């Protein structure tokens, strides 16, 4: 059985969006692998309550890296740019925790799971001699400018500028570049991410939607 260490800031068994996505990945991976999961502590009680109810729960080992309530409010208040300073600090502490776990546990694979936005790849890619997986990767989709016809000048300027900044960051952000090129496997959340990684970095990735499911679940 493979042993995987996973970085997932957001995780909850009782939510959708990023927290629910991470939980769904974990409960399926844990059927086949031993997981060592570093996550933020907001939903610790819900996680610890859910684990004993799962047959694969014994394969899911959680390590909590909590932040303050104030920082959590910044996270949920989308658009609060102050959060990213603390999120970057959280990622560095997670990197330190991961190194400590790897020193004590037999780890086969490192996985950077969420948040899925490409702008913050964390630091686990810096760990040597372990295969590194990053994804699903999102945030690379360009806003269709055709949708801006008839909108106000403020909306047009905002979205056109956002598109340009996105491309600039994909092409020139040094840490993003290092994480992308270090990865043994890249996972794109949507085709737009796949094509952006291919176009600007000349790298291959596989497309697995963040809300992916088994074919059997569709029947």
Question: Each predicted region: which residue ranges?
Answer:
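N-terminal subdomain of nucleotide-sugar transferases
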Residues: 1-59, 103-105, 177, 181-185
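Acceptor-binding helix/loop patch of EC 2.4 sugar-transfer enzymes
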Residues: 9, 69-81, 130, 134-174, ...
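Soluble, non-transmembrane catalytic domains of enzymes that act on hydrophobic metabolites at membranes
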Residues: 10-15, 20-28, 42-46, 102, ...
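A conserved catalytic-core segment of Leloir-type glycosyltransferases
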Residues: 36-93
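Short loop/helix-cap segments at secondary-structure boundaries that form the rim of catalytic
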Residues: 47-54, 123-128, 195-201
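Donor nucleotide-sugar binding/catalytic pocket of nucleotide-sugar-dependent glycosyltransferases
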Residues: 60-64, 134, 165-219
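An amphipathic, basic-hydrophobic alpha-helix
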Residues: 72-112, 118-120, 167-181
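An aromatic- and histidine-rich active-site surface loop
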Residues: 86-95, 99, 109-148, 191-194
């Amino acid at each position: 059985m493979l042993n995987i260490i996973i970085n997932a800031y957001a995780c909850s068994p009782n939510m959708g969006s990023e927290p629910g996505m991470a939980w769904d990945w974990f409960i399926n991976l844990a059927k086949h692998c031993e997981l060592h999961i570093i996550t933020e502590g907001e939903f610790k009680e819900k996680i610890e309550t859910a684990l004993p109810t799962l047959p694969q729960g014994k394969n899911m080992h959680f390590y909590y890296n909590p932040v303050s309530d104030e920082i959590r409010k910044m996270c949920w208040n989308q658009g609060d740019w102050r959060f990213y300073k603390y999120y970057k600090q959280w990622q560095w502490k997670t990197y330190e925790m991961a190194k400590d776990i790897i020193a004590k546990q037999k780890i086969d694979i490192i996985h950077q799971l969420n948040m899925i936005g490409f702008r913050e790849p964390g630091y686990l890619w810096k760990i040597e001699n372990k295969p590194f997986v990053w994804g699903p990767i999102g945030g690379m989709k360009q806003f269709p400018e055709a949708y801006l016809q008839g909108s106000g000048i403020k909306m047009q300027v905002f979205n056109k500028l956002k598109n340009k900044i996105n491309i600039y960051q994909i092409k020139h952000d040094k840490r993003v570049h290092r994480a992308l090129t270090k990865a043994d496997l890249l996972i794109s959340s949507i085709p737009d991410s796949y094509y952006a990684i291919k176009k600007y970095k000349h790298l291959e990735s596989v497309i697995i939607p963040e809300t992916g499911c088994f074919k059997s679940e569709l029947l």
